[in-house]
Amino acid sequence: MAETTVKKLADIVGTPVEKLLTQMKDAGLPHGDASEVVSDEQKQQLLAHLRKSHGAEDEGSGKKITLKRKSTSTIKTTGAAGKSKTVNVEVRKKRTYMKRDVVEAEEREEAERLAAEEAARIAEEEKRAAQEAAKRAADDEAARLKEDEARAKAEQERKAAGEKAAEEKSKRVSVPKVSATKKPAKEETPEEKAKREEAERKQREADEAKRKQEAEARKKAEEEAARRTAEEAARIAAELEQRGEQEEKKPAVEDDKGSSIVNAAQEASYQREERQSRRRRRKPKVAGVVHGKMKSSMNKQHGFKTPTEKKIYEVEVPETITVGDLAQRMNIKAKSLIKSLMKMGEMATVNQPIDQETAFLLVEEMGHKPVASKGQEELLEDHLAADLVTRDSVDSEHRAPVVTIMGHVDHGKTSLLDYIRKAKVASGEAGGITQHIGAYHVEHEKGMITFLDTPGHAAFTAMRARGAKATDIVVIVVAADDGVMPQTEEAINHAKASGAPIIIAVNKIDKEQADPDRVRNELATKDVIPEEWGGEYQFINVSAHSGEGVDDLLDAILLQSELLELQAQASGSATGVVIESRIEKGRGTVASILVQGGELQIGDMLLAGAHFGRVRAMVDENGKAIKKAGPSIPVEVLGLNGAPEAGEQIQVVTDERKAREVAEFRQERDRELKLKRQQASKLENLFENMGSAETKTVNIVLKTDVRGSLEALTSALNDLGTDEVKVNLVSSGVGAINESDVNLAMTSEGVLLGFNVRADSKAKRVCEQEGIDLRYYSVIYELIDDVKQAMSGLLAPEKREEILGVAQVRDVFRSSKFGAVAGCMVVEGTLYRNRPIRVLRDDVVVFEGELESLRRFKDDVPEVRNGMECGIAVKSYNDVKEGDKIEVFEVKEVARFL
């Protein structure tokens, strides 16, 4: 046999020589050159190493080998143009070899296992059959003994009754002569009675011994059958093992033989059991005769007894439940439950949800016991709370204070924050006003401070309330030249409601009109007393323009935070609050989050209200990417599946499935609440509009840049509605205006409004084609004013009466053509012919109509001025008297405005 070198082995295997040498070196072989010889043992060692490195087991080496062969040849073919070309042909072959003893051993082991299982099953079947037969025999014996005892007792009672009857008869017949000839009845002597009882006892003992012998014989037969079955199974297994070494072609023959033996034994056992049960089968025995009718000894075990008492259930009632589910829990039909609801004055369908209180009343009405239970959402919320408890076990550390800047619009909140941050932010806000919460953290020489800048406009009340809720310290900015304004009072109320400490920053003290004492006096009337006056509020004079007093303000903030002793967990699952959220093209949902505890990292599963998602990226307020954020750090998070509401609590959960379930339940809950509100408003509107004219509506499709602005605009627009004109928000959302928004506006005949967003190319094209009114806004004042103007256009005009002139009747003439004609003097204004008139008598209106004729002398004139005489004929009125006044007026329609 030719020797195999490393190079030849590489050609056979199809591997480069360098790679094969590396693998041989890893396997511990001494080969370093391609010309060295490789033995069979070394090949096996290399193969075992490769199998082990690729995940195969060591014990499998040597049992199975796969060989590949590749040969390359060339053939010449003629193409379509008659030219010949050479084609390379590559033939690949693959064969797998296994040792025969491995296959035989596996087949032998499988056959032995099957035979043992079959034998065990047969033994179990025979044992169970023997036990059942013994049980049936014992039952038959007990029934027989009971029957014998009953028969003997009945016989004794019959004899006793006969003896008693004979004795009474003998007493009644008392003839002395005849009694000498009569033979007395033969009575059983005590000796005979004792002999009879002894014979019966011996018979019972013999029967008992016989029954015990039969039971022992059955037990021995059962053990013998099990032993024979085990011996047969062992014999079959040994025979299979002996034949497995010789037989190679059909290993299944032993299996067939073994299974046939087992099947035959099993069939014989079944036939024997069937014969025994057939012999023991008896007809129902007669227990006695009652009034000439036979009474069966069989018990009526399957007799149905009608329930006489009503079953009372304990019905678990969650917070909301549908009528159908409640009926199913009480085991009644839904129709009866709907009838009970109608009696209570509430109309409902089978699938309509009802609240827990109504369900309690219904359950008590139906006679059952209601029990309050937690819904699935509450259970999930409890699991999340348990996760928070485990996180709270981490030691707390000192954290930076969260400071909210609040105050009236244009009082310099953002400018003050700009000076602290040394950046210009207010210039980027439209109209120079802040329209959503900005979050920033500032590194001061004495510590870090996180600032929240809230809008000062009245429409952002809810946003300011959220800012006060998430804060530790509130800084209220008041302009020294403007004093306390409405939003200043509102900010003070929000801060007091949240319980956060308040610091008053009196801004713009560098102006000539500045009067800090006036601010102190005005705030003192609002129960905000300065410290220097004996109160508890710090007043700091600052100037956002020159920077005067800014350091004092920061020192006051840090001093107040030290008094509060703010603590938070620096590690563990993060919790916080959503400051703002928006949808950006190319980035998706972007949520501004203030971390309040724990550590938020990239890759965490975040649950925010009814939305969830994995954190894909985080950036700080400067746009710089970060990987983690600790307590009191504001960040922007990417990865949520939707834009959450501002103010929603966020929490990091470990399980994505749990986060999805909680988010879906919260969405379903919000949808049900929304439907309930809509249904209630529809019913209210139905009764309000009954008998009145139809209310006009302004349909609006609104898109904004962030959630906070959307909420503020929605609240402001809903407040604009009146009894005559209402605002109907057909759709509202966050993000750019797309084609579906345009189609919605076109269908509802509404106006499309964009606040700090723009429409894409498709939406613009559809707007131009269909003539949809599309408007862009960057300041909230302008949007609200335009909507007011549109609503004013739908208002019915106001009708106003204007008196044009008054004439006094001096005399009354009769005319064949007009009847009574009043000769009048114009005492006020001008009289016009084609105008409505009123006839006043003693300054009381007695007639209202129109002029039929207006003449001066004998000429018809269109008008008569003040101080002139004229003749007036009133149409359809002839009761004009001297001294009356004729008033000419005009009705004008005046446009109304909200």
UniProtKB/Swiss-Prot annotation:
Residues of the region (G3) are 453-456
Identify the residues that bind GTP: 407-414, 453-457, 507-510
What the entry lists under InterPro entries is as follows: DNA-bd_dom_put_sf, EF-G-like_DII, IF2_assoc_dom_bac, IF2_II, IF2_N, P-loop_NTPase, Small_GTP-bd, T_Tr_GTP-bd_dom
Swiss-Prot/TrEMBL keywords? Cytoplasm, GTP-binding, Initiation factor, Nucleotide-binding, Protein biosynthesis
Residue ranges, annotated region (G4): 507-510
Q: Name one GO molecular function term.
A: GTPase activity
Q: Name one GO cellular component term.
A: cytosol
- Subcellular location field: Cytoplasm
Q: Does the keyword RNA-binding apply?
A: no
Residue span(s) of domain tr-type G = 398-567
- Spans annotated as Disordered: 51-70, 114-303
Query: Region G5: what ranges?
Result: 543-545
Record's CDD domains? IF2_eIF5B, IF2_mtIF2_II, mtIF2_IVc
Biological role: One of the essential components for the initiation of protein synthesis. Protects formylmethionyl-tRNA from spontaneous hydrolysis and promotes its binding to the 30S ribosomal subunits. Also involved in the hydrolysis of GTP during the formation of the 70S ribosomal complex.
In the record, the note on similarity to other proteins reads: Belongs to the TRAFAC class translation factor GTPase superfamily. Classic translation factor GTPase family. IF-2 subfamily.
* Protein's name in the database: Translation initiation factor IF-2
Tell me which species this is from: Alcanivorax borkumensis (strain ATCC 700651 / DSM 11573 / NCIMB 13689 / SK2)
